[in-house]
UniProtKB/Swiss-Prot annotation:
Protein name: RxLR effector protein SFI5
Primary location: secreted
Motif (RxLR-dEER): 44-62
Pfam families documented for this protein: WYL_3
Signal peptide: 1-20
Length: 241
């Protein structure tokens, strides 16, 4: 009896071992598949993130070289007494902005990338920066109070422009650069220096001359990569002539 039962026990044991091995292999295969799936997802995420960074970098590069508005345009709007809210209506985005504020719609990030909103934001930042200027602060304060179209604003504008003109004409006046348009002012100074250098000795302006002009224009040694990029670009343009 025992002899007959022994082969059966061995068969059951072998069957159990084989089943266990198959189950282990299947489990390992599932785990490997899950790991591979997760890894693929992470890699796709990294590729997407990298692509997003590249797109954002390209957008920032275009923004640095192609601002939504020029300083002259924004200065003209400010002197006309135009508020940021009035400009939003002019751009046709006032209603959308109100909807985002009241409803918190999910596609607000897409809206913020539109040319209209970028112009609005650029002008808003310009007004905030001009508010820090002692000369133009009273004008901006009146604009914020929706008094930009009043006679009082026009009278104040005449006084401000007269005061600014006198300061610019004074030889001892300290040049104050608008933080929003600092690089543009520096470029203008550099271009003027290049023209003077050409008139004096007909030689190509040296990099040292350009750097000195930048320091004089900015009242400090340039430390941002944007300023050095401007210098490099002007230098290359100069050498091509």
């Amino acid at each position: 009896m025992l002899r007959q039962a022994r082969p059966l026990v061995v068969l059951i044991a072998v069957t159990f071992l084989v089943a266990s091995e198959v189950f282990s292999m299947a489990l390992a295969s599932d785990q490997n598949s899950n790991v591979a799936s997760i890894t693929s997802q992470v890699q796709r995420l990294l590729r997407t993130h990298h692509a997003t960074i590249k797109v954002n970098a390209d957008s920032e590069e275009r923004f640095l070289t192609e601002p939504p508005l020029t300083t002259d345009e924004m200065m003209a709007m400010m002197k006309a007494g135009k508020s940021k809210n009035a400009y939003a209506f002019e751009l046709g985005i006032a209603g959308q902005m109100a909807d985002f504020i009241n409803s918190g719609l999910p596609d607000i990030e897409t809206f913020k990338k539109t040319p209209e909103f970028q112009k609005y934001e650029f002008y808003m930042n310009f007004l905030n920066d001009m508010r820090k200027d002692d000369d133009y602060k009273p004008l901006v304060e009146m604009i914020k109070k929706n008094k930009g179209e009043t006679e009082a604003f026009k009278t104040l504008l005449v006084k401000v422009e007269d005061s600014v003109s006198k300061k610019k004409a004074s030889p001892s006046a300290i040049v104050k650069l608008d933080p929003l348009n600092r690089e543009q002012a520096i470029v203008e100074k550099i271009e003027l220096a290049l023209k003077k250098n050409q008139a004096l000795n007909k030689n190509k302006a040296s990099l040292e001359t350009i750097e000195h002009t930048v320091r004089m224009a900015a009242k400090s040694k340039p430390s941002t990569w944007k300023i050095f990029k401007i210098i490099s670009r002007l230098k290359k343009l100069k050498l091509k002539r």
